[in-house]
Swiss-Prot record:
Protein name: Putative uncharacterized protein FLJ33534
Length: 174
């Protein structure tokens, strides 16, 4: 906890898309477990964050995970941080570049953007109500800049990731 609290976390993003990027200057392994109300979601996210990279967290509303009783699942994509010399070009989704890698091993077609807030070692997630999101050709646009709804925070804990789970958090540039 002390290790994470001493790091410099930077938030940036666009309210129009509801997407907020988290930029970190180092290479920590971060394991997180989502809690939804009193129920703990069993899906764990492992992130390998590269220096100068942006981390995007999206809501995965796939039917499979809904059937498994997980009302909240989050996938993460990675991309190099934008720079004046070589800004990343948006991909088909309009939010992430083509070389994004989702922690679940595949891209989700129902990814809703969330807003992130760092409070010590806690990553707070905020989302728009479903009524404020409309789907158009696989892209999610916010109808109105309605206030984000706060969800339980994700506790960030540094630690080693088992080799069998390395595939859940891959980041490869083009």
């Amino acid at each position: 906890m002390g290790l994470l609290s001493q790091r410099k976390w930077t938030l940036s993003g666009s309210q129009q898309t509801g997407c907020v990027a988290l930029t970190v200057p180092s290479f920590p392994w971060v394991a997180s477990r989502m809690h939804y109300g009193r129920k703990q979601v069993s899906w764990i996210i492992f992130l390998k964050i590269g220096a100068g990279c942006q981390v995007h967290v999206g809501h995965d509303c796939s039917t499979l995970r809904r059937q498994q009783g997980a009302p909240w699942s989050f996938a993460s994509s990675f991309r190099p941080a934008a720079s004046p010399l070589a800004p990343p070009s948006p991909g088909v989704s309009g939010l992430f570049p083509p070389h994004e890698r989702w922690s679940g091993g595949s891209q989700t077609r129902c990814g809703k953007c969330v807003k992130m807030q760092i409070l010590g070692s806690t990553l707070k997630l905020f989302r728009h109500p479903p009524s404020q999101v409309t789907r158009l050709w696989g892209r999610h646009h916010l109808k109105t800049p309605a206030p984000f709804l706060q969800s339980p925070g994700i506790q960030l804990n540094p630690g080693k990731v088992p080799a069998s789970l390395l595939r859940l958090a891959t980041w490869k540039p083009l």
